[in-house]
Amino acid sequence: MPIHVVKSGETIYSIAQLYDVSADRIVYDNELAAQQNLVPGQALLILMPSRVHIVREGQTIEQIAEEYSITVKNLYQNNPFLLNQTYLLEGQSLVISYEGEPLMQGRISGYAYPFIEPYILREVLLYIDEILIFSYGFTAEGELIPPQIDETWVIQEAWNQQVEPILVLTPFAETGTFNSGLIQILSENETVQDNLIENLLETVREKGYVGVDVDFEYIRPEDQVGYADFVNRLRETMNENGYRVSVALAPKTSSYQKGLLYEAMDYHLLGQSANTVFLMTYEWGYTYGPPLPVAPLPNVRQVLEYALAEIPKEKIVLGIPNYGYSWLLPYERGVTKARLIGNVEANVIAAERGVEIQYDERYQSPFFYYEIGRRRYEVWFEDVRSIYAKLQLAAEKDIRGVGYWNLMRPFRANWLLVNQMLH
């Protein structure tokens, strides 16, 4: 499963000849249709088929899957373009299997809002095991506030593809904005906790969720124990009724780490309280900060190693970002606001501006600079090299799996890579 880094003068066809694979498949797998040309330094996923089926007249997907003793979903995973075909074409090539063995049998998850594009959702559901639907808020009395857009259709699509939907609980008030006061009320008041837990159980049952993910941030240090107690009480009730609870953790590297984002996140307590944890190992480079990789590998490794010292490895999910940022230079603290971009979009920008993509070996992250008029920008994003490095780390530590924030933007090469490495 090579990852090819484009050199100056190379074309899709010369690369296809080099690996003896289809040029059309390289374009499709790497979502190159929007690019006028390849970019020096761009990383391309090259999947090498080990077994291919040529469609015969009248054959169906189900018949082909049965012929090779694989599932229909396996066939779609290896050939996601089938999602957009109403029938098979005689003579069409379908990949039955690819070369290479998976690194681990990890679980794959990701967050999504109910307004995700249907075509993105349908494809990503081929490759994940759990979808965390963002999000339910709550009132000071413990009443649930549902998402502004009804999420029922996402739940139904998930179950249609044997993917487990999980309700995400956030401290969002009726205004739809973050409210740290709600965390304080919940942490201090067991009556509010009881009401919220009861409402969560009812909603999980009615909607068809398999559990709850608690995603709270900026918790007061004095609410540390009360928050962990709430997660524990929620987990006990959910487990008794056949559901599970996960908790999202800010990226800490020590128990004494200062800052409102970190101090009340007691990895040991929360690891005991929840069934699983989701490490938010991203946002080192963020909207209002200086240009940096979103998830530099040394930092990610440091957080994971601290988590492993506090939490059983089978409970840990490593967070991976599915986005990048573009910063206007020079960076001015309190003034500069980075623009959020997709990883496929980053390659398109580099192609349009005719600039080379560079790769920081220490951070294991791609980046580049471009100009519009007299304005200069710096971009950090993810590509298949940086994703591969994170998946290798997850496999090395033998943890539960990986999870994405978030699933809203296309990144097909990532999902094909995940399918090869973790399934």
Regions found by a protein language model. Give the residues of each.
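Substrate-binding surface in catalytic domains of secreted glycosidases
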Residues: 140-149, 225-229, 233-350
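Glycan-binding loop/region signatures in secreted carbohydrate-active enzymes
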Residues: 168-183, 322-390, 421-423
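Active-site groove signature of glycoside hydrolases
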Residues: 132, 195-226, 276-290
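Conserved, mostly hydrophobic/aromatic
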Residues: 131, 214, 277, 318, ...
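Primarily a LysM-type cell-wall glycan-binding module
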Residues: 1-19, 42-69
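Glycan-recognition patch characteristic of GH18 chitinases/ENGases
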Residues: 99-195
